[in-house]
Amino acid sequence: GLTTPTEKIQDTGRLQLPEEEHYPYGDFHPQCWIYRQYGGNHGWEDLADALRDSCNIYFYTMGHRLGIDKIDEYASLFGLGEYTGIELPEVKGYVAGPATSEALGVEWYGGNLLNAAIGQDNTQVTPLQLANYIVTLLNGGDHFVPHLLKSVKSSDYSETVYEQQPEVKNHIALDPANVEAVKRGMWEVANDPKSTVDQYLSNLAVEVGAKTGSAQVGSADKEADAVFTL
């Protein structure tokens, strides 16, 4: 594989590659949010650390290694930018990539890969797609079709008139060690004092994991929209 759950990536504030590796993005050195806001960095981070801290540099680095084709392949397998199949009107949205840019009539540049790696650029997904993606990841790779109705009972609850059977759309082969690292990172988001949101989630009646996100609105003078998955 291209990495392991325990590999640590150094966040110095701006994306840098090892000296012996060609840097293909010209003068574009995207920054981590902590550098933009506070002039700081996260130092050395593994996968769980990066999830807890939303370390852009870690995921820029992974995006660089994967390439946009592999990112788009897995995004589709997890149902991002695809119809979920729920019994409601829905939109597919987009996952950033050369084909999406062409369809939208905009230019695709190599550096767009880095923005796509953190869910930005032209990526637009629905809350249900996001939730179903997390479920698929954490259950070990079974991508289910979501449904509104679980079952129908008779008026006295003595009989089940209808019961929706689980419907697996596809299965993704996931390394259990990787899944456990993601679970640990999401647990730390909700419970580790180093997290920016643990104060809101660590004392709930039910122990939870979470992931924060920022849906940027394309304007520097407007606040980004916050998104949470629990």
Locations of regions flagged by a protein language model:
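Beta-lactam-recognizing serine transpeptidase/beta-lactamase-like catalytic domain environment
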Residues: 2-230
